[in-house]
A protein has these predicted regions:
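Extended hydrophobic
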Residues: 182-254
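Amphipathic alpha-helical effector-binding/dimerization core
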Residues: 69-71, 75-170
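Cysteine/selenocysteine-centered motifs that mediate thiol-based redox chemistry or coordinate metal-sulfur cofactors
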Residues: 163-174, 251-264
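Short amphipathic alpha-helical/adjacent loop interface patches that line ligand
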Residues: 44, 55, 80, 101, ...
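Short, solvent-exposed recognition segments
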Residues: 3, 133-208
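N-terminal helix-turn-helix
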Residues: 1-95, 255, 259-263
Length: 264
């Protein structure tokens, strides 16, 4: 005679469902940030009140934060990056690139960002800020669409055309700045980036207006673009002369990190 397995208490089932809902909320914020409560409820099909409770729980635990208080939009907190989650056996990109990022920031006295590709997005994994009063600030853990940044353009310039066209069909997150990117102009930018080795993002950017940036792709040993180094400059300080001076430095920095990856 076999002992029957006792039924799980209803409270235990509710607790598990609550945990799963909270994890789902976390995953969607990480994928779509910055994102609001209503949009989260729609895309997860979880009641708005449950989404709100999950967000507060994750905020209290240090995993999420409000990134746009005025519009109640959420994003991941730096603690997520502090876990150091990465594929076993892979070199630590942040550690390899750290001296290169710091040197580029010192050479230019502008903000430098290191970001890894994650699907349709770039995730900032390291920043080195300038000591200037007016500067560009982007938190570690911030996710931005490939289609909205110079780093993303640099990545796409090293992808097959079919991969780029596939990206164009994906849903884009909403930002305060409209309209969304002009795909005709973006195709021209990608072609130009492939030719010269770096991408530019002007001050009229869809994602960060009043910021100009220069980005170059970092490749893995197989030649696939996996990350970017980006130099971000307030538009009030940016000039074409800086492009001529700084772009070769950004390209050289990305090439050096690519070499370090290949040798590690």
């Amino acid at each position: 005679m076999h002992d029957e397995e006792p039924e799980k208490p209803a409270s235990g089932v509710r607790t598990m469902n609550s945990v799963l809902s909270t994890l789902r909320v976390f995953e969607e914020v990480a994928q779509r940030q910055p994102i609001g409560v209503s949009e989260l409820a729609r895309c997860t099909e979880i009641p708005k009140s449950t989404v709100q409770r999950g967000l507060i729980t994750l905020q209290q635990a240090g995993w999420l934060k409000v990134v746009d208080a005025e519009r109640s939009r959420w994003g991941v907190a730096p603690r997520v990056l502090a876990l150091g989650l990465r594929d076993c056996g892979k070199p630590d990109l942040k550690e390899l690139a750290d001296p290169v990022v710091k040197r580029l920031a010192a050479e230019t006295n502008e903000t430098v960002m290191l970001a890894e590709r994650d699907g349709d997005n770039l995730v900032v994994i390291a920043t080195q800020h300038t000591d200037q009063v007016v500067r560009v600030v982007l938190d570690v853990g911030t996710r931005v669409p490939l289609l909205a940044t110079s780093g993303g353009t640099a990545i796409m310039a090293r992808l097959d055309e079919s991969e780029v066209e596939e990206l164009f069909t994906h849903e884009l997150p909403e930002f305060a700045q409209d309209p969304a990117p002009d795909f005709v102009a973006l195709r021209r930018d990608i072609a130009l980036t492939a030719k010269r080795g770096y991408a530019l993002n002007g001050s009229s950017s869809w994602y960060r207006p009043q910021v100009s940036s220069i980005g170059a792709a970092i490749t893995d040993p197989a030649g696939r673009p996996v990350a970017t180094i980006t130099l971000a400059i307030p538009d009030m300080r940016y000039s074409r002369a800086q492009e001529k001076t700084f772009a070769p430095l950004v390209v050289a920095a990305a090439a050096e990190v690519s070499r370090l990856l290949a040798e590690s």
